[in-house]
A protein has these predicted regions:
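Flexible phosphate-sensing "switch/lid" loops adjacent to ATP/NTP-binding sites
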Residues: 1-174
């Protein structure tokens, strides 16, 4: 929802006069959905190429899972590069003054989910961006929670040892 809100804000900004002078052909932020429909990956809307991703492959999912707290989440949301102006200047989400709206949609999602396994053990399930676009594990918050409150914390790193383990050691463990 937050990802597509940002897409709608970009579109509306351009429609309402484009004060930031965003070039519609140079929008880098991609729309997303939870259905892997290959026909929606590359579209042309109003003469502009538009791309859809699945949620787990979105920058928004990576940001949610890499954020350490609410302030970190806000900072990362503001740093989303949404595109470029006709003059090749970068435009960030913070330039559209929408960070608080995005944050309000994501603040509860920042909290890990506690579930019970079939063996009656507690498990934290939270996030999971793909390793080809992000760190490929659950959220940093849930890992840190597990490390501070339990005897054992198990983290699954996606995409095998060549990518998943490398990103786990380079990004998550730090």
């Amino acid at each position: 929802t937050a990802n597509n809100l940002l897409s709608a804000i970009i579109d509306n900004h351009i429609f309402q006069g484009n004060e930031l002078n965003i070039d519609p052909a140079k929008i880098t932020h991609e729309r997303c959905m939870d259905l892997n429909d290959r026909s929606l990956r590359n579209l042309k809307i109003n003469g502009v190429d538009v791309h859809f991703n699945i949620s787990t492959a979105s920058e928004m999912m990576a940001i949610l899972c890499l954020s350490k707290n609410e302030n970190d989440l806000k900072t990362r949301l503001g740093n989303i590069l949404v595109g470029y102006t006709y003059e090749e200047k970068e435009v960030f989400a913070r330039d559209l003054q929408c960070v608080n709206a995005l944050f309000l949609l994501l603040k509860d999602a920042l909290k890990p989910n506690m579930v019970k396994t079939l063996e009656n053990n507690l498990a934290l399930v939270h996030g999971g961006p793909f390793a080809n676009i992000a760190h490929g594990t659950n959220s940093i918050i849930s890992t840190n929670y597990g490390l501070h409150h339990f005897d054992y914390t198990i983290v699954e790193a996606g995409f095998g040892s060549d990518m998943g383990a490398l990103k786990f050691f380079d990004i998550v463990v730090r």
